[in-house]
């Protein structure tokens, strides 16, 4: 169980508060953009070298459309659908923020130094709670703050775009793999 799973569970057990679904969900108010903004960021995860299928963006988008059109699938109640979408969006947000900050590779599988173990920071409940507070205060700013800000990381993102434009060859696969490994290492936070 990850820190963000613990925080997610604790939040919904202790509070009766929605982050994503509110009165504006079925109206034309701008606040509806929050869920759509989250789906935008999740849908563009490939800019970080992560498989775009890592998050269930299409599934969540389809469920949001069901809510907006009040067109429920057979056997699904509105309450259940709202709860599912709320939970999925919050779980995806916490996973996204924590993994962009501390890395997608599980800590037990990291070999950051073959001779000396270099201690790494991990996503803890304090960070995950702060991420929820940030989401509550200003969702769009929270999404932007979650993005890695290192100039080296941005350079690697530019290089990834360039390499992806080369097509598929043994050379590009080799180069892309090395680039993806270095992008992951750049996300790690050293203690």
Give names to the regions the model predicted.
Residues 1-191:
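Auxiliary tRNA-acceptor-end handling modules of aminoacyl-tRNA synthetases
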């Amino acid at each position: 169980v990850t820190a963000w799973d613990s925080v997610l569970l604790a939040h919904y057990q202790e509070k009766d508060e929605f982050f994503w679904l509110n009165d504006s969900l079925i109206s034309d108010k701008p606040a509806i953009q929050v869920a759509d903004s989250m789906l935008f960021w999740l849908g563009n995860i490939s800019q970080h070298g992560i498989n775009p299928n890592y998050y269930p963006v299409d599934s969540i988008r389809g469920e949001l459309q069901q809510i907006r059109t009040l067109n429920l699938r057979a056997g699904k109640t509105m309450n259940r659908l709202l709860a599912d979408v709320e939970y999925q969006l919050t779980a995806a947000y916490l996973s996204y923020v924590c993994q962009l900050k501390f890395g997608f590779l599980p800590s037990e599988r990291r070999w950051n130094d073959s001779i000396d173990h270099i201690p790494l920071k991990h996503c803890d409940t304090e960070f995950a709670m702060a991420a929820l507070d940030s989401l509550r205060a200003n969702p769009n700013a929270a999404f932007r703050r979650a993005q890695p800000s290192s100039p080296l990381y941005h350079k690697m993102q530019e290089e990834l775009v360039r390499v992806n434009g080369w097509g598929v060859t043994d050379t590009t696969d080799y180069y892309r793999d090395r680039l993806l490994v270095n992008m992951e290492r750049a996300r790690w936070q050293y203690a």
